[in-house]
Amino acid sequence: MATGVLEEWCGAPVTVEVRHRADGRLLIPSAERTCGRGSTQAEAQAEGDAFLPPERVAELMWLSPGARVQFRTVHLRAGTDKVVTASAVVALDRISPEERSVLSTTDTPLGRALAAGGGVRRVMVASSEPTRLEPAVRPPGDTGAPVLIVTALLCRGTVPIGLVRETFLRSLLDRDAVHDA
């Protein structure tokens, strides 16, 4: 998936660094409850990364409230450069025990971990957001500035098994690798 494309673009192996991983339940706050610090919504978001609200995750992935999920936040690196940050929600009851084990114990990229259980494809982009690099906000050499944010649904057949939000960083565009058009 994204890792293979990045390796081709960068002309170098891409490594994954899992920054946060937690198995839990998709908890959807009731309408009358407000979500503050320590609320159940915090459990439905990957650490330090803006993700979709839990009710939107449930809608896109066809999940019931309380569904077993894994929340993941990773950095993808080409050499020492961080080129992408990604957050994901994976429906644990829709993947094999072997896939759950790989996701819980290794830094294997999400696409590769899920591909072992049968074809996974990106069937829908929930959103794609180009990002302007504002010089007043970002210093000229800020390689960590986002340039594109993509939110995609991962499916096996017609069944959603994951939702991933990838933030492509300026460092990806600043790489010296030669790219074919």
Describe the residue ranges of each PLM region:
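Composition-driven recognition of glycine/serine/threonine/acidic- and proline-rich low-complexity segments
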Residues: 1-181
